[in-house]
Amino acid sequence: MNTNVFRLLLLGSLFSLSACVQQSEVRQMKHSVSTLNQEMTQLNKETVKITQQNRLNAKSSSGVYLLPGAKTPARLESQIGTLRMSLVNITPDTDGTTLTLRIQGESNDPLPAFSGTVEYGQIQGTIDNFQEINVQNQLINAPASVLAPSDVDIPLQLKGISVDQLGFVRIHDIQPVMP
């Protein structure tokens, strides 16, 4: 009789233990699905921004648009050659937004000293029918590069616009600066 009770207790314990193991696996699976859902949502947002950035640049006759949410560089044919531009280190600031404009030359020559114009603001409407609102601009200057291929990081402070409000940054009129 003692062995039967012992077996019954052992069987009950094993059954309870297997139920616990299954519950922890279910919890882990739910956590994994939740994490995957969040990552997919973020990827979808980035995909929309990349598509918008590409469409804006296809329509642009002057300069290149960079959308903060796209996290993707765009190419600009300029007087100093083909440049890849991207926005990095976008952070809130007490006066607005700070970010770094990364400019990369695509040739095997160092970049000359150059200047350009940066415009930034909000986009209202659809990509097919949009308006740039609250647009501000600032001039940028970059020294000549010594190495090739060249990368230039230009820190920018975008006053009067928060990270959430920043809809676009457009760079245009890149010109060599004569010494």
Model-assigned labels for residue ranges:
Residues 1-20:
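Sec-dependent bacterial lipoprotein signal peptides
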Residues 2-5, 32-47, 51, 155-179:
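Contiguous hydrophobic segments
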Residues 5, 70, 115:
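Solvent-exposed, flexible loop/coil residues
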Residues 16, 22, 162-165:
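Short, solvent-exposed coil/turn linker segments
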Residues 20-88, 92-98:
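Membrane engagement elements in two modes
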Residues 73-179:
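Membrane-proximal structural modules of membrane-associated proteins and complexes
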